UniProtKB/Swiss-Prot annotation:
One GO biological process term: positive regulation of neuron apoptotic process
UniProt keyword annotation of Cell division present: no
Gene giving rise to this polypeptide: CASP10
Keywords in alphabetical order: Apoptosis, Disease variant, Hydrolase, Protease, Repeat, Thiol protease, Zymogen
Broadest EC class assigned to this enzyme: hydrolase
The protein, known as: Caspase-10
């Protein structure tokens, strides 16, 4: 599949518009009546209902998609998504793509909602006998017309008996008639709780779309479901005004609540995202722990580049930066205790803690090779331990391995692990507290890579996007993850980046302008 902005068919075709419509006509001719109904159902909420009701063929639906800018010759991905969902995967060849390519892009480009996907899955699991029983249970409230399982569910939705946040009626029906479908509903609830909500792609972001995607939906779920069940409930929503001062950028962070798969409700995750406004003269403190040398582990060549650019960028953003090099376990505890009690937090809006070192699953190494759990580090800055940071965003960026696997797919090194050490569970990594963000250079179980001269891919990309995307810094963590998928070592390995929760950040342009860094590609 070619990147967005390029045709999925030969650009040498004459009369491209006709050629594209011919492809749509071929797809139409291979779809039956039920396929058309499925397409119409999946487009509810994206295409006006009146237009869908009048559509009698797939080509009618395609015409509406074209009119609504949901489908174009340059970007037919939404149609590919629809064909994938209704299991017409053979027809993807007419869009010059494969089901594997669609699966890879779905986590970041999915248009059909989880709720609509759920209803479609349920409709396929409700046979004629099940449907008859369900209709019998709701006989008094249903019209006297013949219904399919799909139209039955669509009617319940239209009547307001079910919606994405209210599945009680549906659960009761399934529990009575077809209990096995309750698994689908529970799966939907879990996915909705951990869903990464991304804003529409802007023009600047288009260049990132269509490239090889970095993190599959499975990777994301694995990471988020590893978090503690009670963690990061969004009990606070800090608001400190809305005016930038001192020429530094005003940062607004949304969705800083935790992403525990079992406890995060939908309103918290998608509708009531916390908003933090930063309007003080002092943005806050940025602490950088930069470990280069170790007792027996390999030196981390290039880490000074990461520390240097982190320091420069966060100073540019208005933070006071403190760098600590080659920190032992005892020294780390001293740093944590000092920062926990630092009176400067009272005058700041935010706290940033960056760790550049070797690591393992859920833990990082000190320079004397003591393994320190990430949770232990973060727990110093909860509202109870550090009241001055209560209801303020606390951002932790960690450049370190989280496992030993290399994701298959210049001089490069992994931020290596000591295989003799026992792994630490990520379930103990996150404090049960609001207002934390944890950004890891890679998902659990995988190594992260560092160029011995230019620094790590994760940190360099993070800083590059912090600079480049001001003032519309809406997806810098997601973009940091995306660009990781395009970086490869000489042996064809790629790095998987991870963040622990959905986050969007916007900022005003700092003054004076920041100079370019030649070390960042």
């Amino acid at each position: 599949m070619k990147s967005q902005g390029q045709h999925w068919y030969s650009s040498s075709d004459k009369n491209c518009k006709v050629s594209f419509r011919e492809k749509l006509l071929i797809i139409d001719s291979n779809l039956g009546v039920q396929d058309v109904e499925n397409l119409k159902f999946l487009c509810i909420g994206l295409v006006p209902n009146k237009k869908l009701e009048k559509s009698s063929s797939a080509s009618d639906v395609f015409e509406h998609l074209l009119a609504e800018d949901l489908l174009s010759e340059e970007d037919p991905f939404f149609l590919a998504e629809l064909l994938y969902i209704i299991r017409q995967k053979k027809l993807l060849q007419h869009l010059n793509c494969t089901k594997e390519e669609v699966e890879r892009l779905l986590p970041t480009r999915q248009r059909v909602s989880l709720f609509r996907n759920l209803l479609y899955e349920l409709s396929e699991g409700i046979d004629s006998e099940n449907l008859k029983d369900m209709i019998f249970l709701l006989k008094d409230s249903l019209p006297k017309t013949e219904m399919t399982s799909l139209s039955f569910l669509a009617f319940l939705e239209k009547q307001g008996k079910i919606d994405e946040d209210n599945l009680t009626c549906l659960e009761d029906l399934c529990k009575t008639v077809v209990p096995k479908l309750l698994r689908n509903i529970e799966k939907y609830k879990r996915e909705k709780a951990i869903q990464i909500v991304t804003p529409p792609v802007d023009k600047e972001a288009e260049s990132y779309q269509g490239e090889e995607e970095l993190v599959s939906q499975t990777d994301v779920k694995t990471f988020l479901e590893a978090l503690p069940q009670e963690s990061w409930q969004n009990k606070h929503a800090g608001s400190n005004g809305n005016r930038a001062t001192n020429g530094a950028p005003s940062l607004v962070s949304r969705g800083m609540q935790g992403a525990s798969a079992n406890t995060l409700n939908s309103e918290t995750s998608t509708k009531r995202a916390a908003v933090y406004r930063m309007n003080r003269n002092h943005r806050g403190l940025c602490v950088i722990v930069n470990n280069h040398s170790f007792t027996s582990l390999k030196d981390r060549q290039g880490t000074h580049k990461d520390a240097e650019i982190l320091s420069h960028v966060f100073q540019w953003l208005g933070f006071t930066v403190h760098i600590h090099n080659n920190v032992t376990k005892v020294e780390m505890e001293m740093v944590l205790q000092k920062q926990k009690c630092n009176p400067a937090h009272a005058d700041g809006d935010c706290f940033v803690f960056c760790i550049l070192t070797h690591g393992r699953f859920g833990a990082v190494y000190s320079s004397d090779e003591a393994l320190i759990p990430i949770r232990e580090i973060m727990s110093h800055f909860t509202a109870l331990q550090c009241p001055r940071l209560a209801e303020k965003p606390k951002l932790f960026f960690i450049q370190a391995c989280q496992g030993e696997e290399i994701q298959p797919s210049v001089s490069i090194e992994a931020d290596a692990l000591n295989p003799e050490q026992a792994p630490t569970s990520l379930q103990d990594s996150i404090p049960a507290e609001a207002d934390f963000l944890l950004g890891l250079a890679t998902v659990p179980g995988y190594v992260s890579f560092r160029h011995v001269e230019e620094g790590s891919w994760y940190i360099q990309s993070l800083c590059n996007h912090l600079k480049k995307l001001v003032p519309r810094m809406l997806k810098f963590l997601e973009k940091t993850m995306e660009i990781r998928g395009r970086k490869r070592t000489v042996w064809g390995a790629k790095q998987i980046s991870a963040t622990s929760l959905p986050t969007a950040i916007s900022a005003q342009t700092p003054r004076p302008p920041m100079r370019r860094w030649s070390s960042v590609s």
